[in-house]
From Swiss-Prot:
Pfam families: GDC-P. The glycine cleavage system catalyzes the degradation of glycine. The P protein binds the alpha-amino group of glycine through its pyridoxal phosphate cofactor; CO(2) is released and the remaining methylamine moiety is then transferred to the lipoamide cofactor of the H protein. It catalyses: N(6)-[(R)-lipoyl]-L-lysyl-[glycine-cleavage complex H protein] + glycine + H(+) = N(6)-[(R)-S(8)-aminomethyldihydrolipoyl]-L-lysyl-[glycine-cleavage complex H protein] + CO2. GO terms for molecular function: glycine dehydrogenase (decarboxylating) activity. Disulfide bonds: none annotated. The glycine cleavage system is composed of four proteins: P, T, L and H. In this organism, the P 'protein' is a heterodimer of two subunits. GO terms for biological process: glycine decarboxylation via glycine cleavage system; nucleoside metabolic process. Its EC number is 1.4.4.2. Belongs to the GcvP family. N-terminal subunit subfamily. This is Probable glycine dehydrogenase (decarboxylating) subunit 1. Keywords: Oxidoreductase. InterPro entries: GcvPA, GDC-P_N, GDC_P, PyrdxlP-dep_Trfase, PyrdxlP-dep_Trfase_major, PyrdxlP-dep_Trfase_small. SUPFAM superfamilies: PLP-dependent transferases (SSF53383).
């Protein structure tokens, strides 16, 4: 008997041959790695009471489904998680515009003559981002911050061919660190970590000077860093890096650039970051938007990963958008390509372009100021109830670490108590940075009102007072 026309390998004979090739006796053995207590056997499946048993109307089906869903405990908590993904407000117009058929497509615009709309939108994203970063060339997106950083380091190794060492901050985002290690593991490269100053939470300049040498291809610095603090020595770090002819890579939060100096002004050769705050929402962790930019040096531009959209003229003199410098990408031999990121995050980039266009220059600045002041208000209020909000003596943008060692319990207990009050507390970072003890990273954005912050303080004070009894 032939396989089902729409379901491949659906006959018993084909399945048995596949299992024999794999080296297992039957389907149950194939799924042995899955714990038995969460598996359903064939007999259990055959006897399972599922389905509605008879055709029903759409409205009846809707009522049944809503009744089932109402059994879930669903709440929208106050969310104060930091660490790389943030609860920012997403204007409703963004979802409406990116849902248009011209944008909401998996089509990769390799035929520019019939893709002018989407190519222009991506060109606008690049232009807006270049202005925000004060950088010359921006690609039209990477997967996320972590992949953008890893690609920037690979790009540095291609540009500085005879240098085989990378310097990273020891207090970088631990998730980014894992991604970077995965990307660089097949390459002949040494990764060393520069210590952070335990008073300021910033890069230890003396340790950087001791570890940087003529074999260093690139140095990466994040500002605001993983702890939320603004790297006030970024320009000096860039000068140290350039003195030995290495590349200076900066990681940024795009909204923070409404207040602090952009990477281009600080001397960065490459800038990377996360576009999630620019109208994307949390999205259960993705899709996000990797920001990637470089200064105008063709040695750098030709080694950039991802695609670049350019503006040119057609044969009849009309304005035309097209993908440029494509010989860097997957159109050439895979081993020679600068990266193999293909469809990437074009829709996310268009959403970010809409967001930036909506806010404009003054809007970005006002938003950054609002976030800065609210986060500092939160720090002052939390200090009032006896929490250590001054682990490091530096200025921060929208998140900062809070130490809970002095209340006598693990942070997990505090977090669970907050959840009982529909408050999702900060991200515990003591497992990544054990020297900080029971410490969590709390973030505050424009969605957190003064009343929200006061409520958080009130509930934390209640927890502390209860523990003192």
């Amino acid at each position: 008997m032939d396989s089902h026309p729409w379901i491949p390998n659906s006959t018993r004979e084909i399945r048995e041959k596949m299992l024999e090739k794999i080296g297992v006796k039957n389907i149950d053995e194939f799924f042995n790695d899955i714990p038995r207590n969460i598996r359903i056997s064939k007999e259990e499946w055959d006897n399972l009471e599922i389905g509605l048993k008879k055709p029903i109307s759409e409205i009846t089906a809707r009522r049944i489904i809503e009744e089932k869903l109402s059994m879930n405990k669903v709440f929208v908590p106050l969310l104060f998680l930091g660490g790389g993904a943030y609860p920012h407000y997403v204007p409703s117009v963004i979802k409406y515009l990116i849902s248009r058929g011209e944008f909401l497509t998996s089509y990769t615009p390799y035929q520019p003559e019939i893709s002018q709309g989407i190519l222009q939108a991506l060109f606008e994203y690049q232009s807006l981002m270049a202005e925000l970063l004060d950088m010359d060339v921006v690609n039209s997106s990477m997967y996320d911050w972590a992949s953008a950083l890893a690609e920037a380091l690979l790009m540095s190794l291609r540009v500085k061919k005879n240098k085989k060492k990378i310097l990273l901050p020891s207090n970088m985002n631990p998730i980014h660190k894992r991604v970077v290690n995965t990307y660089l593991s097949p390459h002949n490269v040494r990764i060393e970590y520069v210590n952070y100053n335990h008073d300021t939470g910033l890069i230890d300049l003396e340790d950087l000077k001791n570890k940087i040498d003529n074999d260093t291809a690139a140095v990466y610095v994040q500002s605001p860093n993983f702890f939320g603090y603004i790297e006030e020595n970024a320009k000096e770090i860039g000068e140290i890096v350039h003195d030995i002819d290495s590349l200076f890579i900066m990681g940024i939060d795009p909204i923070s650039l409404g207040l602090i100096k952009p990477p281009g002004e600080l001397g960065a050769d490459i800038a990377v970051g996360e576009g999630q705050p620019l109208g994307l929402g949390l999205n259960y962790g993705g899709p996000y938007l990797g920001i990637f930019a470089t200064r105008m040096d063709m040695k750098l531009v030709r080694q950039m990963p991802g695609r670049i959209i350019g503006l040119t003229r057609s044969v009849d003199g009309s304005r035309a958008f097209t993908m440029i410098l494509q010989t860097r990408e997957q159109h050439i031999r895979r081993a020679k390509a600068t990266s193999n990121i293909c469809t990437n995050e074009a829709l996310s980039a268009i959403a970010a372009a809409i967001y930036l266009a909506l806010l404009g220059k003054s809007g970005i600045r006002k938003l950054a100021e609002l976030i800065y002041y609210r986060s500092h208000y939160a720090q002052a209020r939390l200090r009032e109830i006896g929490l250590n909000t001054d682990i490091f003596k530096s200025d921060f943008f929208k998140e900062f670490p809070i130490n809970f060692d002095n209340i006598g319990v693990k942070y997990r207990y505090v977090h669970e108590k907050l959840l009982e009050n529909n408050i999702h507390g900060g991200l515990y970072i003591g497992n990544w940075f054990p020297e900080l003890g029971e410490t969590a990273l709390y973030a505050f954005t424009e969605i957190h009102t003064k009343n929200d912050i006061d409520l958080l303080v009130e509930k934390l004070a209640d927890i502390i007072n209860e523990l003192k009894r």
